[in-house]
Amino acid sequence: MHPQRSANPIDAIAPDKIRPRNMLPNRGRHFLRQTLLATLLGVASAAPLMAAPLQLPALVEPASQEHHVGKVIFVELVTPDLAAAKHFYGGLFGWTFRDISAGGTEYAEASLDGRPVAGLIHKNVPPGEHRQPSWLSFIAVRDVDAAKKIALQQGAKVLFEPHSIPDRGREAVFADPQGAVFAVLASSSGDPPDVLAAPGEWIWSSLMTSDPDTAAAFYQTLFDYEVFDFPADKPARHLILASDDYARASANALPANRPNAHSHWINYVRVEDAVKMAAKVVSLGGRVLVEPHVDRHGGKVAVVADPMGAPFGLLEWPDTESKEVNK
C-alpha cells in the first residue's frame, strides 16, 4: 500500500481463474495484475476514535500526482497508549517513529527505511466505554465531498466530516451500510505507486462483512471497482475488489462461528515468516487471534492483536509470484 524503492508490480492469476459477478455490473473487462491476497477469518473492531485534524507530512515525497482511486493508500492506528504501541510495532516490524503534536493531540508517524508506513493517534477511551483500538484504512478518492454524497446516497453514515489537512490532503471517515468503518483520502501529493510491499509494509486489506454481495455493491458504486468471484470455478466465498487492473481488497463473509461479530476492515502486513512473527507478537505482549495457516492463494496468514487489542494481519508472501497475464 506504500511506495517501495526496488520492487516491481506483481501480476495476478490467469484470466481463466476469475470472472466478474453477473449481479454486479462492471464497466470494463480488465484482468488483474496484483497478486490476489485474502483471508477467510477476521475479528471484530469497534468504530475508531477520531482525533482532530493535524498538520501532517505529504503522503508522497516528492509529489507524483499519481492517483489510484480505490487503493488503500494509508492506515492509522487509534490507540489509548501511544508509547506502548510504538514499543510494540517498533519491536515487531522495525518501524521508527517521529512524534507530531498539535492542538493537544499526540500523533506519531511510523516509517520503515525512511518510507512512511502508518500513523498512530493517541486517544483516551472514556471510563465505562469498551471501544476496541483499531486500524483505520484510508482509500484513495479524487473528490472527498463527492464521495460523501455518494456514500450517503448508498446508505453509509458520516463519522468524521470532510476536512483538509495541510500538505496531506482532504479526508473523511464513513461507516458503510453494514457498519464497517473506513476513511477516504484525496492526497494532495498523489498516491503511492502500485508495487509489491516489502516485509514490514502493508500488503493487503480485507473487508469482513455480514453481506459480501451488498457490501461489494456499495464499494463498487463508491470507488468504481470491478468485482470478481475468486476462484471462479467454486461457489463464491469471497469477492475481489479491483481498480486500474489491480486487486485492491477483498470482501469476505464473517465466520459462521462468530455470530456476534461486526463488519470491519482488517489490514495485513507482509512478513517473511508468519509463524515466527506470530510468536514475536506474543513475546511483545500481543495475542494471536487466528493461528498461522495457508490460505487459498498459497500465502500463509495469521490474525493478531497488539497489547491494546487492535487487530491486524500477518501475511507471508513470496517474491516469486510474477505470472504474466495476457489480456
Model-found features: residue ranges?
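N-terminal secretory signal peptides that target proteins for export/translocation
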Residues: 1-31
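Core segments of cupin and vicinal oxygen chelate
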Residues: 69, 76-115, 153, 159-169, ...
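Short loop/beta submotifs within extracellular cysteine-rich repeat domains
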Residues: 85, 95-97, 116-118, 128, ...
